[in-house]
Amino acid sequence: MIRQRTLKNTIRATGVGLHSGEKVYLTLKPAPVDTGIVFRRADLSPVVEIPARAANVGETTMSTTLVNGDVKVDTVEHLLSAMAGLGIDNAYVELSASEVPIMDGSAGPFVFLIQSAGLEEQDAPKKFIRILREVTVEDGDKRATFLPFDGFKVSFEIDFDHPVLKGQTQSASVDFSSTSFVKEVSRARTFGFMRDIEYLRKHNLALGGSVENAIVVDETGVLNEDGLRSEDEFVKHKILDAIGDLYLLGNSLIGEFKGYKSGHSLNNQLLRKLIAETDAWEVVFFEDASTAPISYMRPVAAV
């Protein structure tokens, strides 16, 4: 049986919020079967919980924000992407502020944290959402689609009218039955343009952004001393973002996601449309792991 999994141990990290610029203490904790991923604002009294579900998304400007009344948690997508990539079903994410720390701008540090905490299988079957037919949302020339696929595959195409990105790979497709999230996607960093920074900061966005936690691009090139981690890092980061956004379904997917110039808003619209169209999906689990179209690395002992 493919089982649900959580963390073996509690683990902590410190960072800054990309948009708020605030110092943030992050604690990842094990959670019982069928809890899902739940964010906790531990700086508030009483503590406020926000489950990582599509219906709780309140803002999608530059990041995905979860809300519960007037309480919010910003920039959840990179951590959720790491949770999805490592198959974590149940965990508590405690924060000392309103934003998940940006770390290095990728999911890599979160993967390291989760692997350091160790993974623990639980005594319940892992639930998957299987896509049964095409579901699409569009906004102008932007598009996001779910398709049936016997596995999990994410295809993405970006089209930035920028001299530097014009020369880079702007499309990618990753079939996770033949390659790993950790290897292919997890280290791709978020990116931003110098031309946008003044506008963003005027609107209290990207206050914590720097070359330490993002790829920064001006009209002539990439400003980061070490350059790109891969030629397709820009589009791979959009895949990373999409995987995090899709995990707001609350379960791992069996199907294909295709995005064309899609972002957090359109990704969330697609999830809401899928959830509403109950004939487009089904919940499945696998008593025999060898029959499943998706496999996960075996849990290893915590380091």
UniProtKB/Swiss-Prot annotation:
CC per GO annotation: membrane
Co-factor(s): Zn(2+)
Pathway(s) of this molecule: Glycolipid biosynthesis; lipid IV(A) biosynthesis; lipid IV(A) from (3R)-3-hydroxytetradecanoyl-[acyl-carrier-protein] and UDP-N-acetyl-alpha-D-glucosamine: step 2/6
Broad EC category: hydrolase
Biological function: Catalyzes the hydrolysis of UDP-3-O-myristoyl-N-acetylglucosamine to form UDP-3-O-myristoylglucosamine and acetate, the committed step in lipid A biosynthesis.
Protein family (similarity comment): Belongs to the LpxC family.
Name under which the protein is recorded: UDP-3-O-acyl-N-acetylglucosamine deacetylase
Organism the protein comes from: Pseudomonas entomophila (strain L48)
Active-site residues, Swiss-Prot/TrEMBL: H264 (proton donor)
